[in-house]
Amino acid sequence: MEIAYFLGCIMNNRYPGIEKATRVLFDKLGIELKDMEGASCCPAPGVFGSFDKTTWAAIAARNITIAEDMGADIMTECNGCFGSLFETNHLLKEDEEMKAKINEILKETGREYKGEVNVRHFAEVLYNDVGLDKLSELVEKPLNLNVAVHYGCHFLKPSDEINIDNPERPTILDEIVEVTGAKSVEYKDKMMCCGAGGGVRSRDLDVALDFTREKLTNMKEAGVDAIVNVCPFCHLQFDVGQMEIKDKFGEEFDIPVLHLAQLLGLAMGLPKEDLVVDAHQVCVDECLEKLEELDRLAPGSG
């Protein structure tokens, strides 16, 4: 199986460990991730899509045409990128007039949108194409951790277009997490936004941090060891946001933040250097030390 790997902007610039873990994981699964040469920003669904739908769709469609030239479906592990690319693909496949309008724009770049590929999310590929049984075979170090799963906004919605899971009571990420040996802990307002999306973080950081602070409070009350997400922007909001909340409110949560790819990487036994967790703002060492201690105490560990 081959798939066009759309990186987006935040992951490879701020959290390269997500990409590293993904490449190692998919190599072990026998899935080839093909680089999308010339791909640009997705662009962001809330900001661009709300103010200039035509330009937003044209930029997204251009990215899709790169995958069409490669003859492969697109996979991304950013909810915002997934939202823009999936919704544009759906829109242009359904609306011939809009498709023609976008292709007039793309003609200036020598490209044409044909509607020949699908846009897929990293987690959905793992769940539907790989399967939980295959993933469990790769687990070398079961993770005895309590984690708060954060779904985010664009992974499952709009639900009339995206049919991955129940948008209000999903289980797909919880099931993948528990393959690693970790426990997905329920917490209040689990499906609430992280606070970053829709241009909120850029326009009004205080409002964004109010969202984040509320979610972190609920997670801490649930007694979690780490937060697991499937979007680098959500990841940034929980990671950098904890430092910003400390500065603004004087509150310290100290909850490590891991992308699902990094959590799977830990379960596969990848060293923290490969996961580049040292690039995170919130230190993950306490979480890793807990795993190492449990590993030492495990029967047969010597």
From Swiss-Prot:
Query: Which residues are connected by disulfide bridges in this protein?
Result: none
Family matches, as InterPro entries: CoB/CoM_hetero-S_Rdtase_bsu (IPR017678), Cys_rich_dom (IPR004017), HdrB/HdrD_reductase (IPR051278)
Q: Which domain of life is it from?
A: Archaea
Q: Does the keyword Oxidoreductase apply?
A: yes
According to its UniProt entry, one GO biological process term is: methanogenesis
E.C. no: 1.8.98.5
Cellular component terms per the entry's GO annotation: membrane
Q: Does Nucleus show up as a keyword for this record?
A: no
Top-rank EC class of the record's enzyme: oxidoreductase
> What catalytic activity is recorded?
coenzyme B + coenzyme M + 2 reduced [2Fe-2S]-[ferredoxin] + 2 H(+) = coenzyme M-coenzyme B heterodisulfide + 2 H2 + 2 oxidized [2Fe-2S]-[ferredoxin]
| UniProt GO molecular function | CoB--CoM heterodisulfide reductase activity
Keyword vocabulary terms for this entry: Methanogenesis, Oxidoreductase
The pathway it acts in is: Cofactor metabolism; coenzyme M-coenzyme B heterodisulfide reduction; coenzyme B and coenzyme M from coenzyme M-coenzyme B heterodisulfide: step 1/1
Extract the NCBIfam families matched here.
Answer: CoB_CoM_SS_B
Similarity comment: family membership: Belongs to the HdrB family.
- Subunit (UniProt): The heterodisulfide reductase is composed of three subunits; HdrA, HdrB and HdrC. It forms a complex with the F420-non-reducing hydrogenase (Mvh), which provides the reducing equivalents to the heterodisulfide reductase.
Task of the protein? Part of a complex that catalyzes the reversible reduction of CoM-S-S-CoB to the thiol-coenzymes H-S-CoM (coenzyme M) and H-S-CoB (coenzyme B).
Q: What is this protein called?
A: H(2):CoB-CoM heterodisulfide,ferredoxin reductase subunit B
Q: What is the protein's species of origin?
A: Methanothermobacter marburgensis (strain ATCC BAA-927 / DSM 2133 / JCM 14651 / NBRC 100331 / OCM 82 / Marburg) (Methanobacterium thermoautotrophicum)
